[in-house]
Amino acid sequence: MNASKLPLGSFVGTTLLLFILYKLVKLAYYVGQAKKTGLPYTLVPVLETEFLGKLLTPLIRPLFTSRLSRGEGWPRWIRFSILDWAWEEKRRVHEELGDVFLLVSPEGLICYTADADMCWDVMNRRNEFLKPRDKYKVLEPYGPNVATTEGKAYNFHVRITAPPFNDGSGANDLVWNEASDQARALMESWSQENTTRDLSLDINRLTLAVISYTGFGKRLDFETEVSDLRNKIPPGYKMSLHHALHLVTTFMVKILLIPKWIMKMTSMKEIAIAHGELEKYMREMIRTETAKLSKDSEYQSADAKGNLLTSVLRASAFEAKAAGRKQAFSEDEVLGNLFLYLLAGYETTANAMTYGFITLALRQDLQDRIIQEVDGVYAEAAAEGRTSLNYTDDFEKFQYTYGFMYEVFRLYPGVCIITKMVPKDTTITVYPENNSPQQHVLPAECRVYLNVNAVHYHERYWPDPWALKPDRWMGTIGVTPNSRPNKKVVAQDKSRQVRGTLMTFSGGARACLGRKFTQSEYISVLATVLGKYRIVLGEGMDAKVVKQEIDHLAAGTVTLAPLKYVKLALKKRTDVKTG
């Protein structure tokens, strides 16, 4: 019978049946591949990243909110099909299937690992374990960058983007000072109102102001209201720089996932305009700074200290000169890396700081210890004739605060899964506890997902893993000898020993270049705020509920973020009774 003469219902039914058969054949093929590896495996019909998974997530997630908030995780039948399931599951799936297992679907194989030694091995074999292009292309709305490139292109990007973050570049000093200034403005704002504030909004304002100045050299006052951002539009533009920055950072998820042409046809039109306007502003800044570099020999001195934009352009100029080329980075490559700085320096830092503030409000005992350390550092500075702190003299004195920061990074990592793939058959080594290492061969195109949560909450690596214990970073066991006897670097040296067991900043050959930049901002804000104030829960906030929900639920942004409803307050230290 001719297909055109089939009833519509029969045609649809036949098509659906053929589609299901096609999926079953593919599933059977990948099951065969999984068996050859010798690893345990489990089956799933639909992955979280497929269209159907994305469609199901907003429909199904609300049905399980109560269950998730109690820390019970997802039912087995649905967990792998829900976006961002890994945060709610923590280690549960690995306790059932093992530290290393395969997830088999009609789309292929995914190797999930919570084995820290294997994670470290994978992160260091960067030419064998690549970043999946389909996963990372989304991070190139303006151009390629150091996070999305591979091979020789990655080496090229690192040579130019790494120097701006070195201690001698001045970037860490710049971010410390700006973060301290913005934190003082935050305190002034909170103290004047003497009320509960929107924590999420204020932390985001602070970090946006910091990255605006340290990234582009454009100062944004903490108190600037959204309505004020709309003013002062230069000729040739449709909105101000800071309004564009505000919209792009606020709606980062939509910009990364939704095509611009779709946004222009909907209520998201203003977001699409902001996306284009920010690109226009950044290209203008790139051209202006490039012109300065070409005209002013002192301006392009290797010892000159500037914002990240200036530093990247300077490093690019030196790279080009060393290679005998006219230029190193193209304008698109500079733009792509500036966007990456914006993403990491704004959203990731803001979320980590928010988790830290909430934790301190819940744990006044931890706040006591940090305040004690802060007071001690300020006293040392006063004895030296200084009225304020700075990065060079004071950053490394914050040992307990550093340990607290790293515990927050461990318990609430910005990225829950680090994704890799093998372009050809590749051998992995699994390191079972109390057993000999085992080798397995993963087939070409197999994804390898490093489950950050499952490692960070693993008792094998972190005794009492759910507990936030800054002191675990203060021990000297396994710490390299201090080569700088005048520096208090125990906690920092300790953080270098946890190979593969702490992946907040990734690790190995592709560790985050800006981790010291983030640490400087984080500690500067805490030292400034806690020098005069305490962080407490706002009125009406139930500590038990808040703790449950920051541990088990998330806001569903590009990086891990707490739910937005948590309210905090700043109280003068003299007004708060503790103990």
UniProtKB/Swiss-Prot annotation:
Pfam hit, one: p450
Binding site residues for heme: C512
Topology relative to the membrane: Single-pass membrane protein
Inactivation phenotype: Impairs the production of PR-toxin as well as of the intermediates eremofortin A and B.
GO CC, one annotated term: membrane
Protein keywords: Glycoprotein, Heme, Iron, Membrane, Metal-binding, Monooxygenase, Oxidoreductase, Transmembrane, Transmembrane helix
Localization, UniProt: Membrane
UniProt-listed Gene3D superfamilies: Cytochrome P450 (1.10.630.10)
EC number of this enzyme: 1.-.-.-
Molecular function (Gene Ontology), one example: iron ion binding
Keyword Ribosomal protein: no
Residues bearing attached sugar chains per UniProt: N2, N194, N390
Cofactors required: heme
GO biological process: mycotoxin biosynthetic process
Bilayer-spanning residue ranges: 7-29
Domain of life: Eukaryota
Major subcellular location class: membrane
Pathway(s) the chain acts in: Sesquiterpene biosynthesis
Keyword Cytoplasm: no
Top enzyme category: oxidoreductase
Membership in a protein family: Belongs to the cytochrome P450 family.
Function, in words: Cytochrome P450 monooxygenase; part of the gene cluster that mediates the biosynthesis of PR-toxin, a bicyclic sesquiterpene belonging to the eremophilane class and acting as a mycotoxin. The first step of the pathway is catalyzed by the aristolochene synthase which performs the cyclization of trans,trans-farnesyl diphosphate (FPP) to the bicyclic sesquiterpene aristolochene. Following the formation of aristolochene, the non-oxygenated aristolochene is converted to the trioxygenated intermediate eremofortin B, via 7-epi-neopetasone.
Name of the protein this chain belongs to: Cytochrome P450 monooxygenase ORF6
Organism: Penicillium roqueforti (strain FM164)
